[in-house]
């Protein structure tokens, strides 16, 4: 039977380590062994932080310390963001909003694809969208750190309203950028017992994002991957256990948001039990509502209750939610307005998945899909195929009463409040000096080692195939 490469990777991820043999984490990634901090003595006490109070647990100087358990955490009692609770004054957002025309408010809802490894024509096209259409943000894809920072400075210098920048950073900047840290896939993290390490990873990723001038991480994946034939989620999920997915997802979200970047949980209402890639077609999920509530929606409900700032809506066909033919959840008011915003009481930002994906793009003309996504209740339109045409369609819909100006105003102001929370009311200082060095610090690499150590799991060792009983007498091959 043929198995995809990603399927094999997912199996290898589950086979990462042996309980009780901590040192084998180095075997999982031997290059990381060299990144053990030189000033290891700073780890001789275990420090826990809550609010401003530190609790130090001294360790005997002769006691061997398990580095996978060392962490410094600072949790907030309430993880809700100010722009969600709508209680914190946002003078900058209010001022900018009042300065924009209706068309410019519509343009704030668009986040357009950007690459730092493409030619001058791509850059020229983006400059036109920024200066003429006055789009709200960019989602960066493939490239390298220095080139992306150069482009970021260029685009921010020419925009009327500061751009917010997003990236898919599920396992770190390396998902899109060269010369950056590659943290473990979520399936690997799903094998860990120590969830606090996921918080630390989220916090480090937030630090690296801010160094790059990036504000939104389209992560974590909260899909419960209960279909072994899933071609697109697979190792990107924390696994098939809903509690494990939820708990680790929450730690990832808090690590990001408590360190100043916006998390975006995906792919609502759950892309785990599919056997089709929504980049290529529209997958159907035929479960009843009770099943969706108990499995697929479980991690999202918990994330909403804990204050996740944004959620990405998937391109799925779920007849129990909306039985119109070829109607994706992204374009379904029953899914976004009714289920997500009313029934689950989500007050944050809802992003569409990329609107150029065949799961939606094959059924609508450019511009039409954007309007349908807005009517469904989405706040941010990601990767539109034709921004000028989409803005024209939306403006015509406002004029005809198909969508209200008040709806546009509400969503635009929510985006501007988010930008203010992200610090975009102040000019960012972007400096390429030592950029790659900063993104690959000893501290970051050492956490990567601890994540590898903590994720090692022995599923079965029949007939002592793995020679751990005589580890000094045998050689172990690492694949």
Language model region names:
Residues 114-118, 165-175, 215-225, 265-271, ...:
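Short glycine-enriched loops at secondary-structure junctions
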Residues 125-141, 203-216:
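Catalytic domains of carbohydrate-active enzymes, especially glycoside hydrolases
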Residues 192-214, 221-249, 253, 257, ...:
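A substrate-binding/cap region within the structured catalytic cores of diverse enzymes
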Residues 101, 138, 148-163, 173-175, ...:
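Second-shell residues forming the walls of enzyme active-site clefts
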